[in-house]
Amino acid sequence: MDPIADLILSFTKFPGVGNKSARRMVFYLLKRDSAELQDLGRRIATLKDELCVCSRCGNVSSGDPCPICSDALRDRETLCVVEDIDDLVSFEQAGIYNGLYHVLDNRVSPFDDEDLSPESVDSLLSHIRELDAKEVIIATNPRMEGDLTYYTLLDALREAPGMREGMKISRLAFGLPVGGSIEFADRMTLHTALESRTAVSAGNGGGEEK
């Protein structure tokens, strides 16, 4: 295959990158000097070697635990549960939340034949117990997969032993558009969704608090 066409095809495998965007990227690279391309290639080749997954929250950083989990100034009694690292980054860049996180790195999606693994749920429950969290914010995306993931987690939290008595469980408010994604939400939208979050009963059979 032609080297240009081959590289374009490789770039189209990136999320959100179509053929036109991939083509622009390739022709941009062709204009750079060899040293710059070699440096970029080295950074890509060593990316996974220089990073690790935080054993506490699932974030990716150069150290374990990650800087967020290591920060003694953060609110260690509030835990925000997100679907993936992109969502964590969105909250951090918005600067609206000062608690800790837990990255699920999977979700419930019937269309993709995905489900929350028992290991993923157990890891979350262990993290909550370790922190003795006062509040768990379930920050799944406002679409069908996020709803299914939310209810799966809610059931697991309600049935789990060893949680703090009176622990609050809440969910982001729908300042986020239905079908949207935390990853692409602006700061004001995320702030509204977080500040107006809905509390739900932690007890078995409980519904949303009024």
Residue ranges and their predicted role:
Residues L37, D113-E114, G146-Y150:
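Alpha-helix N-cap/helix-start motif
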